[in-house]
Every structure is written in C-alpha cells, then in structure tokens.
Amino acid sequence: MTPDPTQLSTDACTLPDGRTLSYASGGDPDGVPVVVHHGTPGSRLFGALLSGPAAETGVRLLVPDRPGYGRSSPPAAEWSWEDWPADLGGLLDAESVERAGVLGFSGGGPFALAAASDDRVARVGLVSSVVPPAENTLATLASVPFALRAMFRISDAVASISGPSAVVSQYTDRSVSDPVAEAVAADFHEALDRGARAVERENRAFASASLDADSVGVPVRAWHGTTDENTPLSPVRSLIDELDGTFETVEADHLGTLLDRRAAALEWVARKE
C-alpha cells in the first residue's frame, strides 16, 4: 500500500478555550470514523501511512495534530493524555461524529486509551504502544528538558540533510519503499516544525505518570512486535491483561508492526458491535 499525502486534506477546529486543533481527513468519507493518534513526535501527516488502507476498509480517517505539534496550538499550561478527551470531544463535535473508534501508535497509545472516557468512543486499538511509566532513554532525558529538546532539534536537522532514511532508521531495521520513507520523514519534520516542546512534554508525562485502566470500559486490542526495540512488549501485555483485552504479537519491529497490521487494526477498530 503506497502512502499518498494527496489523499489527505487538512482542516481545523477551534476548541472552547480558543486553541486551534488541526487535523487531517482521509480514507472513505462515508466510512466509519476512526481517530488516529500519531506517535511522539508525530503529526497529522502520519495519516499518509493509513489513508490507503482506510479507503479499502471503509474507514473515515481523522488524524489530529496533538497540542503543540504541526498546526495545532500549544496548550496554555501543563497538559497530558488526561486532558486529551476534552480536545477530542471538540474534534468529534466539529466533524459531527456520534460514534468513533480510536487507534494509537507508539506515543499515541496513552492518548487513545484516555479517549475511551468519551462515551462516543466505541473501541481502542494500540499499535507498538508506549505504556507509562516508561523506562527508556527518552523518558530519562525528559528529566533534563533542554537535553531532550536539543536531541530532537539535532535529529531533525541531520535528517533534513541526510534524507528520509535517517528518520526511518529510528523506527525500523527493514527496507521500506521510498513513499513510505518519505511519509515517515514528513511526519517527523512536521512534528518538530515549531520546536520540540511538545515531544519533551509528552515524554516527561510518559516517565512520571501511570495509565488509569479503570477509565477504559470499551474493547481494547493491541498489536506489538516481538523485536520492537523502541517500546517494550511486556508492559503492553500486562496492560492488556488488566484491561481484559486482546493481544497479538507480530514478528516485526516498531514501525514494521504498523506497516504489517495497519489494515487489520483499522478494520478491527471500525468494527461495529
């Protein structure tokens, strides 16, 4: 499935506090709405990896820039996934969505789970998800904010010179097509276009907070790679057991799991009870 950014359109809505929430739309405009939560860092352009499968599986794709990423306004103060349902509600209102599935990739996982507190959310899918409290290099660096921001600024600059492969190599060891590499790189650069404060804020939350499993009362399914070196498998398995959800292992790494299971994940999340 070849990513095609032209299959996405960018829209925006104004939230009750005056902030702008930007988002991409794609897939089947008459399909079942699914809100996709990009990684950390990430942006609405992540939707380019999913627009083709969404059209084929009858999914109406909505991919918001979380606050501080892409074209969305930064939050006024400290903000984390616990505050996300209110913003999501603004998006669902703007798009006149009465019922939707949600899907979270990598750092988008905690936000997808938080979204389940909105009674319009029917199902939650997680692909290569982070499970706070996270114990990894980024979580450690988040305790030194300027160091984390500097690392991503340097990574962004190096990738701008070296090309898409410099971004892709952070997420997978496999060889991917040029369109996939370009889509991954475009998502990364758009995420950091206005700096790295959003990625710093999210990683700080990942390191210090825990998920509230009791707030999730809808079906949950996770797909996770057995060779994922970005987000460990065992915390996801434990979380899914706690949620009484469904867990599927994939013989792939971080990005590879998404590429191999994106159509299946969209189809499951959009499935009506």
For each feature predicted by the language model, list its residue ranges:
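Catalytic histidine-centered segment of alpha/beta-hydrolase-like enzymes
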Residues: 230, 250-266
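The serine-hydrolase catalytic nucleophile loop
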Residues: 39-52
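Conserved acidic catalytic loop of the alpha/beta-hydrolase fold
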Residues: 82-101
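Flexible "cap/lid" loop of the alpha/beta hydrolase fold
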Residues: 123-154
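Alpha/beta-hydrolase
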Residues: 149-212
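Short beta-strand/loop motif that positions the catalytic acidic residue
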Residues: 216, 222-224, 228
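Conserved alpha/beta-hydrolase
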Residues: 54-74
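Conserved alpha/beta-hydrolase "acid-adjacent" motif
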Residues: 229-235
